[in-house]
C-alpha cells in the first residue's frame, strides 16, 4: 500500500559484550517483549505456522509456548509486575479509539481492566499516544500516558493494590 511502512523484527539475545548471539525468534514478527527472569522472555509474535499471540521463550533454546490464549489477544506494551504473578499490558485504540490497560493473572488467566482511555483522532500515526503502562517499584500503582480533554498528554496514576487480590 502506498504510504505504508513495513518492517520485520527478529529477537536476538547475546552477552553484554556482543558475543554469544542467539536468534530466539526468527519469525520477523517480534514486538513488545520483556524479560520475565534471566532465562525467559515474553513477546508478542507470530511464529511460523502458528497464530499471533504472546509467547514465552526460553533463551538459547527452541522452547516456546503461547500463553494468555483467548485473554491477551492483542499486541500491547507488556511487563511483569514484581513476583511475576501478574502481567501489566495495554491495547492500541479500538474502533471507538479507546485504549484499555489491564492486569493479567498468569496462574488463573484472570484479566482485570484498569480503565478506558480515549485517544482522540488527532493522536494517530507518529503522533499517537500509547498508554505504555508502567508500575511503581512496589507494584501497587500503575501510571499510563493518555490525552485528557483539551489538556493534551497527561499521566494518569492508578492504584492497583486491591486489583491484585484473587
Q: What is the meaning of each model-derived region?
A:
Residues 1, 21-44, 71-90, 120-138:
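Conserved beta-propeller blade repeats
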Residues 2-12, 49-56, 96-103, 150-158:
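Structural motif
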Residues 6, 12-30, 57-74, 105-128, ...:
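Multi-bladed beta-propeller domains
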Residues 22, 44, 52-54, 98, ...:
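Generic domain-boundary/flexible-linker signal
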Residues 37, 45-46, 58, 71, ...:
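Active-site proximal loops enriched in glycine and acidic residues that flank catalytic Cys/His/Asp
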Residues 38-68:
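N-terminal leader/targeting helix
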Residues 51, 68-112:
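Loop/turn-rich, solvent-exposed surfaces of beta-rich toroidal or solenoidal domains
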Residues 127-166:
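Blade-level signature of beta-propeller repeat domains, shared across WD40, Kelch, NHL, RCC1
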Amino acid at each position: 500500500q502506498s504510504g505504508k511502512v513495513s518492517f520485520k523484527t527478529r529477537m536476538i539475545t547475546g552477552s553484554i559484550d556482543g558475543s554469544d548471539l542467539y536468534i530466539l525468534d526468527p519469525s520477523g514478527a517480534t514486538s513488545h517483549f520483556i524479560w520475565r527472569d534471566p532465562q525467559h522472555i515474553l513477546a508478542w509474535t507470530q511464529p511460523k505456522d502458528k497464530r499471533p499471540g504472546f509467547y514465552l521463550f526460553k533463551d538459547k533454546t527452541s522452547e516456546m509456548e503461547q500463553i494468555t490464549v483467548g485473554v491477551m489477544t492483542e499486541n500491547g506494551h507488556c511487563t511483569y509486575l514484581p513476583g511475576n504473578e501478574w502481567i501489566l499490558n495495554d491495547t492500541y485504540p479500538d474502533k471507538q479509539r479507546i485504549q484499555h490497560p489491564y492486569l493479567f493473572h498468569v496462574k488463573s488467566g484472570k484479566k482485570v481492566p484498569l480503565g478506558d482511555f480515549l485517544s482522540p483522532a488527532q493522536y494517530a500515526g507518529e503522533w499517537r499516544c500509547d498508554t505504555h503502562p508502567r508500575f511503581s517499584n512496589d507494584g501497587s500503582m500503575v501510571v499510563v500516558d493518555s490525552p485528557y480533554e483539551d489538556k493534551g498528554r497527561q499521566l494518569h496514576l492508578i492504584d492497583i493494590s486491591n486489583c491484585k487480590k484473587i
